[in-house]
Design a protein with these regions (language model features):
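Intrinsically disordered, charged low-complexity linkers and terminal tails
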Residues: 1-121
C-alpha cells in the first residue's frame, strides 16, 4: 500500500517524492549550507534498512549508472531537475528508498521548517 502525503497548498506526493521536496525546500531556504552540513542534517542513518545507500549522493554518475552496477532499480532521483547543489557548490542527488518507518525523521525536518502536511493511506 502506498501512502500519499499532501503538502498544504501543493497537492500530493508519494513518500519518496515528499523526501525529495523536503530536501529541495531545505536547500532553497538555507542556500549557504555546505554538503557536509546537509549530510549531517539528512543522515544516512535515517534510511534504516536501506542504509547501504547514501541519503545524499554526490557521485551522480554512479547514481545514474545503476544498471551497470548490477542494481535492479535506481536508488536516486537523477533527472536533471532533481540534481541539487549545496552552498559549497557540490552537486548531489537524493535517495528514493523510503517507507512508512524510515520517513519519520525526514518528516520531522519538514515540521521544523513549518510545513503542514497530512498522511493519507
Amino acid at each position: 500500500p502506498y501512502t500519499t502525503l499532501f503538502r498544504s497548498g501543493e497537492g500530493s506526493y508519494s513518500k519518496r517524492e515528499m523526501v525529495l521536496q523536503i530536501v529541495k525546500e531545505y536547500v532553497r531556504q538555507f542556500p549557504d549550507t555546505s554538503f557536509d552540513e546537509l549530510k549531517a542534517t539528512f543522515s544516512r542513518d535515517y534510511l534504516q534498512r536501506f542504509a547501504q545507500n547514501e541519503f545524499l549522493q554526490q557521485d551522480i554518475d554512479k547514481a545514474k549508472n545503476w544498471k551497470d552496477l548490477g542494481e535492479d532499480h535506481p536508488h536516486y532521483f537523477t533527472a536533471d531537475k532533481d540534481i541539487l547543489v549545496s552552498g559549497d557548490g557540490v552537486q548531489f542527488v537524493v535517495c528514493v528508498e523510503w517507507d512508512k518507518n524510515n520517513i519519520i525523521n525526514v518528516l520531522g525536518i519538514a515540521q521544523a521548517l513549518g510545513w503542514k502536511f497530512e498522511i493519507v493511506k
